[in-house]
């Protein structure tokens, strides 16, 4: 699961850098093919308690800790909110569109929703089908689940039905 990202300023002492914080759960690492190189991913308990902990990408580490090699255990601030670093992601470099995949911060989705976005609902979900062939089936199942959760009426012979109030994007 991933929540909506929020961009802002990350601060460590006199060092600061603009970046994006993503509210996620542990499955996000698998879905996005990310690995924790140092430290660890935050726990289920961190999610349940909306803990102010995070896992950071190498670009964020380089910008906030230019003279230190191990930021695990250190506290950084997102705008004014402190987050303790529990892990550092293995570097992925730039993607084919020229975006720095190491310029990110991951935190428990519950903490981002509560402490940053001040919302009580999930804005975004990331999923991964086991194989490319299962993508359509997964999309259909996700659509069915979301329509049910959002209490949207299906079309019948004499009723048009409710439009989806969500979007599903597919990346292969």
List the model feature ranges, each with a label.
Residues 1-42, 168:
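Short amphipathic beta-strand/extended segments in non-transmembrane regions
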Residues 3-7, 47, 126, 162-165, ...:
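Short linear capping/connector segments at secondary-structure termini
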Residues 9, 73-77, 167:
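Residue-level detector of beta-strand face positions
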Residues 11-13, 96-98, 172:
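Short, well-ordered secondary-structure micro-motifs
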Residues 15, 50, 103, 162-164:
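Exposed loop/turn and edge beta-strand positions of beta-sandwich/beta-sheet ligand-binding modules
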Residues 17, 121-125, 164:
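Short amphipathic alpha-helical segments
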Residues 22, 26-42, 51-155:
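Mid-to-C-terminal secondary-structure elements
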Residues 142, 155-172:
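Peri-transmembrane interface segments
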């Amino acid at each position: 699961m991933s929540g909506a990202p929020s961009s802002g300023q990350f601060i460590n002492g006199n060092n600061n850098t603009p970046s994006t914080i993503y509210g996620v759960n542990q499955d996000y690492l698998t879905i996005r093919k990310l690995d924790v190189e140092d430290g660890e991913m935050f726990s289920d308990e961190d999610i349940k308690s909306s803990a102010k902990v995070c896992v950071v990408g190498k670009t964020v580490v380089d910008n906030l800790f230019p003279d230190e090699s191990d930021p695990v255990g250190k506290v950084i601030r997102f705008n004014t909110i402190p987050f303790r670093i529990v892990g550092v992601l293995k570097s992925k470099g730039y993607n084919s569109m020229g975006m720095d995949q190491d310029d990110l911060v991951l935190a428990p989705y519950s903490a981002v929703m509560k402490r940053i976005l001040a919302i009580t609902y999930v804005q975004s979900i990331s999923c991964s089908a086991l194989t490319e062939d299962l993508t359509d089936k997964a999309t259909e199942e996700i659509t069915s689940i979301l329509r049910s959760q959002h209490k949207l009426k299906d079309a019948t012979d004499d009723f048009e039905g409710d439009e989806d109030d969500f979007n599903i994007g597919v990346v292969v």
